[in-house]
Amino acid sequence: MTNSKNSSNNSTNGNELYAIAETSGQQFWFEVNRYYDIDRLNAKEKDKITLEKILLLKDKNSITIGKPYVKDAKIELEVVSHKRDKKILVYKMRPKKKTRRKMGHRQELTRVMVKSISLGKSAPKSSAKKETVKKETKPKSEKSTN
């Protein structure tokens, strides 16, 4: 009997860089140059958006897991379009009564494209040390007794 699982099947379609991020109260598996439909964002088309709530980041050499988020990791997104999802029908009825109610809902979505995933270092802090100012206090004079 042969093993049908190959090591190449376990890879992520040849992409060695991906990230799991949190947006709109959900977690998404993001890969570079792919489209994703997420809940409506308040942004115009062609706008750039940065996600900083990265839960996991995998690159060629390592996997970084955040506690809860990966520090200094970013995902750059570009808004492609705004659209509406398929209609979901909700049908409510009360048995033995003539009460029926049919409603529909269409979720507002934003289609985004992942431009880059990066684990950048934060901007270097200035090398100047903070100087502490010491106040000189006068010693308390002894109380005079008259």
Curated annotation (Swiss-Prot):
InterPro entries: bL21-like, bL21-like_sf, Ribosomal_bL21, Ribosomal_bL21_CS. Keywords: Ribonucleoprotein, Ribosomal protein, RNA-binding, rRNA-binding. Transmembrane segments: none annotated. The keyword rRNA processing does not apply. It comes from the Bacteria. GO terms for biological process: translation. One of its GO terms (cellular component) is ribosome. Belongs to the bacterial ribosomal protein bL21 family. This protein binds to 23S rRNA in the presence of protein L20. This is Large ribosomal subunit protein bL21. The gene is rplU.
